[in-house]
């Protein structure tokens, strides 16, 4: 594996994981809110 590939993929993977984490957190919050209302 080339160093350049690692340098490109690492921040990309971190950004992707952070986005997925935030979207999941928001989805759970929204689901809890609608669940408690109903």
Swiss-Prot record:
A matching Pfam family: PsbY
Biological process terms in GO annotation: photosynthesis
Cellular compartment(s): Plastid, Cyanelle thylakoid membrane
Record key words, sorted: Cyanelle, Membrane, Photosynthesis, Photosystem II, Plastid, Thylakoid, Transmembrane, Transmembrane helix
GO molecular function: manganese ion binding
Transmembrane segments: 5-23
Complexes and interactors: PSII is composed of 1 copy each of membrane proteins PsbA, PsbB, PsbC, PsbD, PsbE, PsbF, PsbH, PsbI, PsbJ, PsbK, PsbL, PsbM, PsbT, PsbX, PsbY, PsbZ, Psb30/Ycf12, at least 3 peripheral proteins of the oxygen-evolving complex and a large number of cofactors. It forms dimeric complexes.
Annotated protein name in UniProt: Photosystem II reaction center protein Y
Species of origin: Cyanophora paradoxa
